[in-house]
Amino acid sequence: MIQHSVFLRFKAATQAAEKQAIYDAIVALKEVVPGMIDVKYGPNVSPEGLNGGYLDGFVVTFEDETVRDYYLRHPDHIAAGERIVRATDGGLSGVLVFDMVV
């Protein structure tokens, strides 16, 4: 399995409703990406203070790399990604992606 972790540094002006709409768009991809197992999202709750300014995020679990790669190319993912970039501080520099085999 692949765990696809995405950490976000939203602009201060990004409203909670916009954040939720972004997460809803990611969750909706489960309906069109076979092998997309699970999505979790929310704010960082770590007390360590080592978040690098990334205060929100989501984690997607895929059956394998092939499914992950299909998700990355899917038009709905591309649209959600563009929405994320518009909502994050510094555009792409406000997004951190980390994938690992689990």
Protein language model regions, located:
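Secondary-structure boundary/capping signal
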Residues: 37-38, 66, 92-93
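Glycine-rich beta-strand-turn "strand-cap" elements at beta-sheet edges
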Residues: 42-52, 82-102
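Short amphipathic alpha-helical segments
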Residues: 14-41, 76-85
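Short, well-ordered beta-strand segments in beta-rich or mixed alpha/beta enzyme
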Residues: 3-10, 43-72
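Short, solvent-exposed aromatic-acidic interface loops
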Residues: 75-76, 102
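Residues embedded in well-ordered beta-strands within globular domains across many folds
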Residues: 37-40, 59, 96
